[in-house]
């Protein structure tokens, strides 16, 4: 994946939590043209298995890892639905929160941050507020959903290396103590991964 947290983070965090040995290969955007032809659908992230099989699509490949290592209940259709529903819903946030990083005009960046901080993220946090009171989002142990939603805390709202919206993100955490507490639990549970990963802005 690129030298970002972004779409590659859930899979990396899950494998580290599961103590699965893996090689993390990151590269800059300048190297993308040489990697692109060899990637599934010419996209990243990509998960390459020992036999050379290459998997694309970040949610699908992370779901595969979750099922393989005990974070996704393939045999329990209802529990699987609750996990999938949270991941799908989170995409409304996850596919927009990174965009200010790449905006060149300050006015555009400010407008995007305002929408995120006042509309997009609060709406999501209101929906999951009760689920964040204690423990994990689905069931009594960390699940696939947490590796996505927990990244909202570690990659953005509490990421000291982020270059935009810091005041807005701090204010959101103050307004949503349930989510802040959940994020702190997620960070503690994944302390080994967070200590080993790159210090990226997003």
What positions do the PLM features span?
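GST-like fold's C-terminal all-alpha helical module
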Residues: 65, 78, 82-188, 194
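Intrinsic low-complexity, intrinsically disordered segments enriched in polar/basic residues
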Residues: 38-40, 191, 195
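Eukaryotic N-terminal low-complexity, Ser/Thr- and Lys/Arg-rich leader segments
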Residues: 198-202
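GST-like domain detector, emphasizing the conserved glutathione-binding G-site
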Residues: 1-115, 119-123, 137
């Amino acid at each position: 994946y690129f030298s970002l947290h972004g779409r590659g983070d859930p899979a990396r965090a899950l494998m580290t939590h599961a103590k699965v040995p893996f090689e993390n290969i990151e590269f800059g955007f300048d190297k993308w043209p040489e990697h692109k032809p060899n990637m599934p659908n010419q996209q990243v992230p990509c998960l390459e298995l020992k036999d050379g099989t290459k998997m694309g699509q970040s949610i699908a490949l992370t779901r595969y890892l979750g099922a393989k290592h005990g974070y996704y209940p393939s045999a329990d259709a209802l529990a699987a639905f609750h996990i999938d529903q949270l991941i799908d819903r989170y995409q409304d946030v996850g596919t927009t929160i990174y965009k200010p990083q790449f905006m060149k005009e300050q006015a555009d960046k400010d407008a995007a941050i305002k929408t995120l901080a006042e509309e997009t993220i609060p709406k999501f946090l209101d929906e999951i507020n009760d689920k964040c009171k204690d423990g994990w989002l689905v069931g009594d142990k960390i699940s696939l959903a947490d590796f996505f939603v927990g990244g909202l805390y570690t990659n953005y709202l509490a990421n000291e290396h982020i270059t935009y919206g810091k005041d807005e993100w701090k204010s959101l955490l103050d307004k949503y103590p349930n989510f802040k507490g959940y994020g702190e639990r997620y960070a503690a549970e994944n302390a080994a991964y967070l200590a080993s990963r790159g210090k990226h802005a997003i």
